[in-house]
């Protein structure tokens, strides 16, 4: 990160999320006084198997390794009896969320951040030259007012910091996945994706976390209905769920400005609290880390951040992709798979999902008819992803 200011600031980070902890480490390394407030007594978040691009390694460096369970070398796409295989030039990573957060917490503390567990955010007030964060100690109910110049909300899609500072609530969608035995015919370095638009405008996935088990999941639009659809899909694939995992994921509909002036202080949002999620795939780990890089850069650089501008362009393009795909029918996905010639598949494997402009440009150069299919998807919007509940 490039910076131009060198004065020390006091920062309170609310929420021990991946993005919040990464922001804490970035600022603490630059000499900023950072206190992290997390309501749980022990940093043992719910386990969840996730897939990310290799870009996470370049962002976190060695800090990523402890959370990596497996590497993915290819994707298999299925729709209505058709299939396509995409070989990846750089492997995707299967990670475990709990291990990731615990590793980031260790890194933040080593960098100088102070993590205070069992501390629940209660309120935000103006306080002279800065802000006062009111924190409630979960053990005994006592409260403390902490004076800081900057507050960062890293407390997820239902961020209480965002509500206190005046941001509107976010819309979310349900993610449900089941841990299952890996099918005997499935290599451990391969992800399978099924497009079933009568069930979901997104897709089903099966990601292997080891040679013997994986996570089969789906994103839907209604929580109970999504769980039911997943159970039916498991039955159809003859897979038995060993356990279920779930979450509510924010839906990116437009760029959310990440900073607000609050009295004489500043409030920032990172990660899910700012809906920094690729809405094409509902993936938010790498984009959340980019949001953390941008917020840290802005705090250290007088509000200026090139990273945030680049992230906005990336998220807006993923929104365009989602608008194109959201109302695809089975025949459209079949046509999409049929259009994936060898040069197009090669380009898909060479470019990262976290560089969507480059990926789509190269793929469409190899198969121009994909442009017409995408435009048709944009014109099929009898109901729009931009409308809540659509």
Features from the language model and the residues they span:
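FAD/FMN-dependent oxidoreductases across multiple families
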Residues: 123, 222-299, 304-309
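C-terminal auxiliary extensions adjacent to catalytic cores
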Residues: 333-390
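Glycine-rich FAD pyrophosphate-binding loop
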Residues: 12-14, 25-47
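N-terminal FAD cofactor-binding segment of flavoenzymes
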Residues: 39-76
């Amino acid at each position: 990160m490039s910076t131009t200011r060198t004065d020390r600031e006091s920062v309170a980070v609310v929420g021990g999320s991946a993005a919040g902890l990464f922001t804490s480490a970035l600022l603490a390394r630059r000499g900023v006084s950072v206190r992290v407030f997390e309501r749980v007594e022990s940093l043992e978040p719910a386990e969840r198997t996730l897939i990310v691009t290799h870009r996470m390694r370049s962002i976190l460096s060695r800090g990523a390794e402890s959370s990596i369970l497996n590497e993915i070398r290819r994707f298999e796409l299925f729709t209505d009896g058709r299939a396509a295989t995409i070989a990846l030039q750089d492997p995707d990573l299967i990670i475990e969320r709990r291990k990731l957060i615990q590793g980031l917490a260790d890194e933040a503390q080593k960098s100088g951040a102070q993590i205070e567990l069992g501390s629940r955010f209660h309120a935000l007030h103006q306080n002279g030259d800065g802000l006062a964060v009111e924190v409630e100690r979960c053990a005994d109910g006592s409260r403390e007012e902490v004076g800081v110049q900057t507050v960062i909300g890293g407390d997820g899609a239902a961020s209480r910091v965002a509500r206190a500072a005046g941001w509107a609530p976010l819309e979310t969608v349900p993610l449900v996945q089941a841990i299952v035995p890996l099918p005997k015919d499935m290599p451990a370095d391969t992800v399978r994706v099924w497009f079933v638009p009568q069930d979901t405008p997104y897709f089903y996935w099966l990601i292997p976390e080891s040679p013997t088990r994986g996570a089969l999941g789906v994103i839907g639009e209604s929580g109970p209905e999504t769980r039911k659809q997943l159970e039916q899909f498991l039955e159809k694939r003859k897979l038995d769920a060993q356990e279920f995992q779930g979450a509510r994921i924010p839906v990116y509909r437009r760029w959310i400005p990440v900073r607000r002036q609050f009295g004489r202080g500043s409030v920032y949002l990172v990660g899910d609290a700012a809906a920094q999620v690729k809405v094409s795939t509902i993936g938010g780990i790498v984009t959340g880390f980019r949001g953390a890089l941008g917020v840290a850069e802005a705090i250290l650089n007088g509000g200026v951040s090139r990273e945030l501008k680049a992230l906005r362009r990336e998220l807006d393009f993923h929104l365009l992709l989602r608008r194109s795909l959201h109302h695809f029918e089975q025949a459209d996905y079949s046509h999409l798979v049929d259009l994936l010639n060898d040069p197009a598949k090669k380009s898909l494997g060479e470019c990262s999902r976290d560089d969507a402009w480059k990926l789509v440009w190269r793929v469409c150069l190899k198969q121009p008819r994909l442009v017409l299919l995408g435009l048709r998807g944009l014109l099929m919007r009898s109901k729009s992803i931009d409308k809540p509940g659509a």
